[in-house]
From Swiss-Prot:
<feature type="modified residue" description="N6-acetyllysine; by autocatalysis">
    <location>
        <position position="47"/>
    </location>
</feature>
<comment type="function">
    <text>N-alpha-acetyltransferase that acetylates the N-terminus of proteins that retain their initiating methionine. Has a broad substrate specificity: able to acetylate the initiator methionine of most peptides. Also displays N-epsilon-acetyltransferase activity by mediating acetylation of the side chain of specific lysines on proteins. Autoacetylates. Required for the establishment of sister chromatid cohesion and couple the processes of cohesion and DNA replication to ensure that only sister chromatids become paired together.</text>
</comment>
<dbReference type="InterPro" id="IPR016181">
    <property type="entry name" value="Acyl_CoA_acyltransferase"/>
</dbReference>
<feature type="region of interest" description="Substrate">
    <location>
        <begin position="138"/>
        <end position="141"/>
    </location>
</feature>
<dbReference type="GO" id="GO:0004596">
    <property type="term" value="F:protein-N-terminal amino-acid acetyltransferase activity"/>
</dbReference>
<feature type="binding site">
    <location>
        <position position="75"/>
    </location>
    <ligand>
        <name>substrate</name>
    </ligand>
</feature>
<keyword id="KW-0131">Cell cycle</keyword>
<feature type="domain" description="N-acetyltransferase">
    <location>
        <begin position="6"/>
        <end position="155"/>
    </location>
</feature>
<dbReference type="GO" id="GO:0000278">
    <property type="term" value="P:mitotic cell cycle"/>
</dbReference>
<comment type="subunit">
    <text>Component of an acetyltransferase complex, at least composed of san, Ard1 and Nat1.</text>
</comment>
<keyword id="KW-0012">Acyltransferase</keyword>
<comment type="function">
    <text>(Microbial infection) Required for optimal replication of E.chaffeensis in the immune tissues, hemocytes, and fat body.</text>
</comment>
<comment type="similarity">
    <text>Belongs to the acetyltransferase family.</text>
</comment>
<dbReference type="GO" id="GO:0120518">
    <property type="term" value="F:protein N-terminal-methionine acetyltransferase activity"/>
</dbReference>
<dbReference type="GO" id="GO:0005829">
    <property type="term" value="C:cytosol"/>
</dbReference>
<dbReference type="GO" id="GO:0008080">
    <property type="term" value="F:N-acetyltransferase activity"/>
</dbReference>
<dbReference type="InterPro" id="IPR051556">
    <property type="entry name" value="N-term/lysine_N-AcTrnsfr"/>
</dbReference>
């Protein structure tokens, strides 16, 4: 019996086409060229997920400095359907959570989820996210067009403090039980 390996890798000009293809298959919307240019500049905030050396998922985030807050926005986090429920989504989310904790200066992490994507909503609720708003007609050309805004509030550290943001982390069982669904 062999062990399965889940690893995250950088998005580079050499593999950006894999990300584009993955997003085309996983998400019901298409992303413009600017999205991919920005992803190439995102560093640790954009990762491909490999399962036994095969690209099966990706996470792409950006820093949002609006409303007098510094927030981390999850633009996409998804996995090919045959590879869901294997802990890949959890590994991608934990990478982003670790980034936010190490930085220590984020007020929250947030994302938009199509209102009928119950699997994604439940996935994020396991990590302490809450529905904080619903945006009507958020999506164009897909139904339903409304999106929930999910947010996980982080404790912002004081300047010159050595403490890190607090978070809810997955226990060892949640990794094997985590289910990742597509959303935008």
């Amino acid at each position: 019996m062999t062990r399965s390996s889940i690893e995250l890798g950088d998005v580079t000009p050499h593999n950006i086409k894999q990300l584009k293809k993955l997003n085309t298959v996983v998400f019901p919307v298409s992303y413009n060229d600017k999205f991919y240019v920005d992803v190439l500049e995102a560093g640790e905030l954009a990762k491909l997920a490999y399962y036994n050396d095969i690209v099966v998922g990706a996470v792409c985030c950006r820093i949002d400095n609006t409303e007098n807050q510094r927030r981390l926005y999850i633009m996409t986090l998804g996995c090919l359907s045959p590879y869901r429920r294997l802990g890949i989504g959890t590994v991608m989310f934990e990478h982003i959570m670790n980034f936010a904790e190490k930085d220590g200066n984020f007020d929250s992490i947030f994302l938009h989820v199509q209102i009928n994507n119950n699997g994604a909503i439940e996935f994020y609720k396991k990590f302490g996210f809450e529905i904080v708003d619903t945006k009507e007609q958020y999506y164009k050309r897909i139904e339903p067009a409304d999106a929930h805004v999910l947010q996980k509030t982080l404790r912002r550290t004081a300047p010159n403090s050595n403490s890190t943001a607090t978070s809810t982390t997955a226990n060892s069982n949640s990794r094997s039980k985590a289910r990742q669904f597509t959303f935008v």
